[in-house]
Curated annotation (Swiss-Prot):
Subcellular location(s) of the protein: Cytoplasm
InterPro entries assigned to the protein according to its UniProt record, in alphabetical order: MnmA-like (IPR004506), MnmA-like_C (IPR046885), MnmA-like_central (IPR046884), MnmA-like_central_sf (IPR023382), Rossmann-like_a/b/a_fold (IPR014729)
Gene: mnmA
Region Interaction with target base in tRNA: start-end pairs: 99-101
MF term (GO), any: tRNA-uridine 2-sulfurtransferase activity
GO terms classed as biological process: tRNA wobble position uridine thiolation
Organism lineage string: Bacteria, Bacillati, Bacillota, Bacilli, Lactobacillales
Enzyme Commission number: 2.8.1.13
Record-annotated disulphide pairs: C104-C201
Catalytic activity: S-sulfanyl-L-cysteinyl-[protein] + uridine(34) in tRNA + AH2 + ATP = 2-thiouridine(34) in tRNA + L-cysteinyl-[protein] + A + AMP + diphosphate + H(+)
Signal peptide, first to last residue: none
Active site: C104, C201
Record-given protein name: tRNA-specific 2-thiouridylase MnmA
The organism of origin for this protein: Streptococcus equi subsp. zooepidemicus (strain H70)
Length: 374
């Protein structure tokens, strides 16, 4: 029996990119009552006075007109500043390396936007994320990795709750990126050949150091080896992340071998950046971590232990872990030592194809001793 989707209203978050354009197109073709909404989260007028959001909104309007759906623009600049950007700055201020995309999804795209969509009479919201939604016989929603393994975005969606997922659709989840491009080209969408946006949304193509220095004053300090050798000056702890190789300016200085130099630690109180030679430098290896802001995609007990796999950064293979959860905190013990576990980044849990949720890394440990990462 065919279902009548025309009575189901879906509000699509449209960015002006090809993914969200095809999302709207597919839902329209499936008979849903579709409305497109462009979110303006950041005043991104560049040094030439060109606002890229204006260009993106024009693309949204062109696509919406092509596929025959109404569209609106909503301004979330204040919400974004308060809930995402202030968090981003606070994390850098405390020597950590945040992932603003995780917080943007949690607070803006699936909270502020979801709330706004409800005022438009939405039954669901949809975005162009590469993830899959599966509903079981009890009505519980499971979030699965996107079919396109190279594009899977469940890592960035790991802070979504069951309540948020119940109202969410990911129409691209079963497609390869190449198929999405082909659909856009076949339909002659205005965004079919538009290149994907890269980097953090509010920085765009700007130089990261320059951008950050507008908001946080850089404090130069000493760059040291773990055994106390002074290697020169660092530009400010906030500019470096654990495991980073480039940008240290000490490539010519050797320490007995020809291995490259890496950031292996930070001491915020002394404003010291620690460096060491070798990709697997012992200071970069850890055996467990503490995380907070733990969020599971399904209802779970307040306290439990879980054996699963985890990712500690976006583009890395899963690693086997044991997770000890207590309310919104967790201790994650690794089956094998892990490299460059970075406070502020997301740790995300998986059971096979299913994303179970995740948290934010607070501290890494090596055999029970804290690593000097902040």
């Amino acid at each position: 029996m065919m279902t009548d989707n025309s009575k189901t209203r879906v509000v699509v978050g449209m960015s002006g990119g090809v993914d969200s354009s095809v999302t709207a197109l597919l839902l329209k073709e499936q008979g849903y009552d579709v409305i497109g909404v462009f979110m303006k989260n950041w005043d991104d007028t560049d040094e030439f006075g060109v606002c890229t959001a204006t260009e993106d909104y024009k693309d949204v309007a062109a696509v919406a007109d092509q596929i025959g759906i109404p569209y609106y623009s909503v301004n979330f600049e204040k919400e974004y500043w308060d809930r995402v950007f202030e968090y981003f700055l606070a994390e850098y201020r405390s020597g950590r390396t945040p992932n603003p995309d995780v917080m943007c999804n949690k607070e803006i795209k699936f909270k502020a936007f979801l709330d706004y969509a409800m005022t438009l009479g939405a039954d669901y919201v949809a975005t162009g994320h590469y993830a899959q939604i599966k509903r079981d016989e009890n009505g519980v929603v499971h979030m699965l990795r996107g079919f396109d393994k190279g594009k899977d975005q469940t890592y960035f969606l790991s802070q979504l709750s069951q309540k948020q997922l119940q109202k969410t659709m990911f129409p691209l989840g079963h497609l390869q990126k190449s198929e999405v491009r082909a659909i856009a080209e076949q339909a002659g969408l205005a965004t079919a050949k538009k290149k994907d946006s890269t980097g953090i949304c509010f920085i765009g193509e700007k130089n990261f150091k320059t951008f950050l220095s507008h908001y946080l004053p850089a404090q130069k300090g000493r760059m040291m080896t773990v055994d106390g050798r002074d290697m020169g000056e660092h530009a400010g702890l906030m500019y470096y992340t654990i495991g980073q190789r480039g940008g240290l300016g000490i490539g010519g200085q050797q320490g007995g071998d020809n291995k490259p130099w890496f950031v292996v630690g930070k001491d915020l109180s002394q404003n010291i950046l620690y460096v060491g030679q070798g990709f697997y430098h012992e200071s970069l290896m850890s055996t467990s971590l503490d995380a907070s802001v733990i969020q599971f995609t399904r209802e779970v007990p307040e306290e439990f232990t879980l054996e699963c796999t985890a990712k500690f950064r976006y583009r890395q293979p899963d690693s086997k872990v044991t997770v000890h959860v207590k309310k919104d905190k967790a201790k994650v013990v690794f089956a094998e030592p892990q490299r460059a576990i970075t406070p502020g980044q997301a740790v995300v849990f998986y059971d096979g194809h299913e994303c179970l949720g995740g948290g934010i890394i607070d501290m890494a440990y090596k055999d029970g001793e804290p690593c000097q990462y902040i």
